[in-house]
């Protein structure tokens, strides 16, 4: 798109994604005040080029003008662009939220904008890429309700409502009801299919989730967020070759994408290939918004027993912490303390853990259902020698989130429990929990989230107290 004074030129190309072959191109010139009409004209022209027969509903969707305010639509598109990135990071979710809030401020009747705001808030609540407070959950609900009130048959509003029930309430039956309604209005929407894949994944229906991901990718083969989520399913299932193949697809579309390279590194760690992980992580220069990526670099240094450089990096970041990260500041300080402990600086580690505990506890009152935060506190108390508090917190997390309710992240508290039990003198409980974890797919609580593997049991120093136990040795060195 090119802009000159009050005129805009839009250059459009139609490319067959499967073969990257050129099918059609054209140029559209419009006044800036009429820019929104281009979208309808382009959609109709593409349908003609593809000789697609549009249903009445589809013609109405194409003809609809989502807002009469070009600035609101511009903000909406900027927010949407953040949501189409590969990962739900604080940086991406905060960026999306900022622009979409501006869109609905500029046009309070912008139903599509309200629907996207609900989706941004709900996904941020679920993934903790936004601070998962009751206020955020309420904002997601109100935005979805506003979108439906403004346009009751808007597919994106139905999608947002379904996603709210899925992400904020874990009410999967109601979520499916709305997603299926959205699918009838938007039969070719990859976001609806992705939503269905998400719900089935949390239900533990991994094969059904896989089928929805495959359908979505046929519709939208260059959607890197979709491809990344599909890859993460493979990671949780420990199907690492398939995950890596999917990540290569992403890198062909967005070369050098940081979140994709970090996930490749975590797979290498999970497979016990630390040199390969190091080669992927070494070139990355990370801002503070890349929390998972930073933690993956620290984890690499811990696994290698070479934490010196990352200690200096974390100290610099935490000297002036970004308060928009919320509880992640305390989580990063936990990682600093762990690195200091591995480096042998026990007094500095204890000081950092004490500060981390204070920072994390300050968020617990307004985020009482944040299982990630509770897990962080359990590990921090464990490190400080408060075994009773550590175990109480781990068991609190387990009571809040079960594997039966959430097959994807429900096992996370068990991962925390295994670590706490290993370090607090309860090897029987640690090993029985590890046996269960190694037998199921899940998204782990630490760094970029691959589940525990035999290789990680061998490398992770948190399991050092179990090293001489024959039962642990059997888990860490399984026979082929």
What are these regions, as identified by a protein language model?
Residues 1-340, 345-369, 374-377, 386-389:
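Acidic, proline/glycine-rich low-complexity intrinsically disordered segments
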Residues 62-65, 130-131, 323-327, 362-370, ...:
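Acidic, Ser/Thr-rich low-complexity linear motifs
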Residues 107, 151, 440, 460-463, ...:
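Acidic-histidine catalytic/liganding microenvironments
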Residues 285-289, 354, 395-399, 431-442:
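TPR/TPR-like (Sel1-like) alpha-helical repeat modules
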Residues 365, 372, 419, 474-480:
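Low-complexity, Gly/Pro
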Residues 378, 418, 430, 466, ...:
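Hydrophobic, well-ordered secondary-structure elements that form the walls
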Residues 412-445:
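Sterile Alpha Motif
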Residues 451-480:
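Terminal, low-structured helical/coil segments at or just beyond the last alpha-helical repeat
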């Amino acid at each position: 798109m090119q802009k000159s004074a009050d005129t805009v030129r839009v250059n459009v190309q139609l490319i067959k994604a499967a073969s990257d072959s050129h099918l059609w191109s054209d140029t559209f010139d419009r006044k800036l005040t009429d820019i929104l009409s281009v979208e309808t004209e382009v959609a109709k022209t593409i349908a003609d080029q593809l000789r697609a027969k549009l249903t009445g509903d589809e013609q109405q969707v194409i003809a609809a003008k989502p807002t009469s305010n070009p600035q609101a639509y511009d903000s909406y598109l900027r927010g949407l662009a953040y949501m189409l990135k590969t990962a739900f990071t604080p940086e991406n979710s905060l960026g999306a939220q900022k622009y979409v809030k501006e869109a609905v401020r500029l046009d309070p009747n912008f139903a599509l904008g309200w629907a996207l705001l609900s989706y941004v808030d709900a996904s941020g609540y679920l993934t903790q890429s936004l601070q998962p407070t009751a206020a955020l959950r309420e904002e997601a609900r109100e935005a979805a309700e506003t979108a439906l009130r403004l346009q009751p048959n808007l597919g994106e509003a139905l999608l947002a409502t379904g996603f709210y029930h899925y992400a904020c309430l874990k009410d999967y039956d109601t979520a499916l009801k709305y997603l299926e309604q959205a699918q009838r209005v938007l039969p070719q929407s990859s976001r609806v299919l992705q939503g269905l894949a998400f719900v089935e994944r949390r239900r533990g229906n991994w094969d059904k989730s896989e089928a929805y991901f495959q359908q979505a990718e046929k519709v939208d083969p260059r959607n890197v967020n979709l491809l990344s989520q599909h890859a993460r399913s493979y990671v949780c299932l420990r199907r690492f070759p398939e995950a890596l193949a999917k990540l290569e697809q992403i890198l062909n579309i967005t070369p050098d994408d940081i979140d994709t390279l970090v996930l490749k590194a975590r797979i290498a760690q999970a497979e016990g290939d630390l040199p390969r992980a190091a080669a992927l992580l070494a070139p990355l220069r990370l801002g503070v918004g890349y929390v998972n990526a930073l933690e993956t670099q620290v984890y690499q240094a811990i696994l290698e027993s070479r934490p010196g450089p990352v200690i200096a990096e974390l100290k610099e970041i935490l000297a002036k912490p970004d308060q928009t990260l919320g509880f992640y500041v305390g989580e990063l300080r936990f990682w600093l303390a762990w690195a200091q402990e591995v480096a042998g600086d026990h007094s500095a580690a204890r000081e950092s853990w004490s500060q981390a505990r204070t920072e994390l506890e300050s968020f617990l009152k307004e985020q009482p259902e944040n299982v990630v935060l509770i897990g962080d506190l359990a590990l921090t108390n464990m490190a400080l020698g408060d075994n009773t508090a550590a175990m109480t917190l781990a068991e609190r997390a387990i009571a809040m989130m079960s594997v039966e309710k959430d097959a994807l992240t429900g096992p996370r508290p068990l991962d925390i429990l295994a670590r706490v039990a290993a370090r607090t003198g309860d090897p029987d409980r640690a090993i029985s929990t590890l046996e269960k974890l190694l037998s199921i797919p899940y998204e782990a609580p630490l760094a970029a989230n691959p589940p525990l593997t035999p290789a990680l049991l061998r490398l992770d120093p948190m399991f050092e107290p179990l090293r001489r136990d024959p039962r642990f040795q059997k888990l860490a060195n399984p026979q082929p």
